Amino acid sequence: MIKISIIVPCYNVELYIQECMESILSQSIYEIEIILIDDGSTDRTLEILEAYQEKCANVKILKQANQGSGIARNQGIRAAIGEYIAFMDADDFYPSPNTLERVYDTAKETGAIICGGSACNYRNGVYTNRGLDKGHIFSEDGWISKCDFPTSGGYWRFIYKRDFIQSKQIFFPKYLRFQDPPFFLEAIANAGEVYCMKEVTYIHRKEHKQTHFVQEKAIDYARGIRDCLVISRREGMNAACLQLLSILHGGPSACMYLFANTCTEMESIIHQINEVIRDVSKDKTNVPVLKEGEELVNYLNDVQEEKGRLLEGLMQEKSVLVFGAGVMGKRVRAFLDRNGVIIEAFVVSDVTKNAAVVDGLQVRCIDDYIDARNDCVVIIATYPVLQNEIKEILRNKGFEKIYPLSQEKLYLFEGQVVI
């Protein structure tokens, strides 16, 4: 009997697929089938897959013209014969050889329809929890009801009863982006509860994954967000709904705003999302709606005027510092560099937790600039949850010229979204 069918969509992953496959083949549970779906790769991916098929009897290859990973996974679901289904991205891997066996045994012991554990990111050779919301990390083993499940992300760290998925006809929407969270929420909604394990069951590679959102991808991204909000609200999945709303204003909102004026469907999606937000607000949850119509037009004009004032003002400053040396900090530095603004340094509260140099620029402690604080402007380039705290710290240290730059405004300044 095949215990687990592992579904792996593959598109131009020649650099990573071997590590992924070796991770799967090293698993201590032997009763598995590996379904590899080539999504019209143009590099050596298919050649590598065929080499594995030749030497491994449990490897099956499916092929399709380039249509996206969601459609590829749906092919895998239909072809699967295992008791459970697992999903893996072709550039990711399992943390240990007994990971799948541990998850499978736990699922059997508990009778779980959906069972899995925590996740860990892998970025530039470093294992880290940075960038993961709390729903990706569990503090103990146990059941979590659909109402309390805290996120719509991280579907790949779970296994799913195959007959459940197939009989309920739960498939990935045919979106180019954000197609997995709607699948995940639909599965949880139908299962009613999920068994979650404290241990890490999946390693997610992050360093090379970036999407430049052209209109088609942006619309699909917005559709996926809308679908998740509709599903979670319909099913009473309040924790997942609120988690998604908490990150809506940033990259997601900027992505929608940039295309709303030229795409009527994007306008409609924004309106549909706002209907969910207003419904959520009946529960006295303070979530700001997205801008739409004339308000959005005026906002976009104001943002461009603010961009001009900011750049002009920074050109006059003696010293420009960027607080934060992470993803946001690097994006802000690149934006300012393209516009002719010279950054003196990245600054942080504790240099021992950061590299000494990031992207060729020194990382220094903010305290090094206290004596020169009147000559410095500090741009706060962190995620929103930290900005107010950092602003207060800077105020207490005597810095007065402080500019918190939100993710949403940065993307609108740039006129593009890359996530």
How would you describe each model-predicted region?
Residues N12-S26:
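Short, well-formed alpha-helical segments that are part of the catalytic scaffolds
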Residues S23, D38-E47:
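A conserved acidic beta->alpha catalytic loop
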Residues E31-G40, K60-A65, D89-A90:
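Short beta-strand/loop segment that forms part of the nucleotide-sugar
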Residues Q64-A80, A90:
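Glycine-rich, basic loop-to-helix element that forms the pyrophosphate-binding segment
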Residues S69, A90-Y195, H204-A218, A260:
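Donor-binding/catalytic cores of nucleotide-activated saccharide
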Residues I85:
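Short aromatic/hydrophobic "clamp" motif used to bind/position activated sugar donors
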Residues R205-S319, A325-R338, I380, I419:
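C-terminal subregions of glycosyltransferases and related glycan-biosynthesis enzymes
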Residues E292-I419:
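Hydrophobic, well-ordered beta-alpha structural blocks that scaffold small-molecule cofactor pockets
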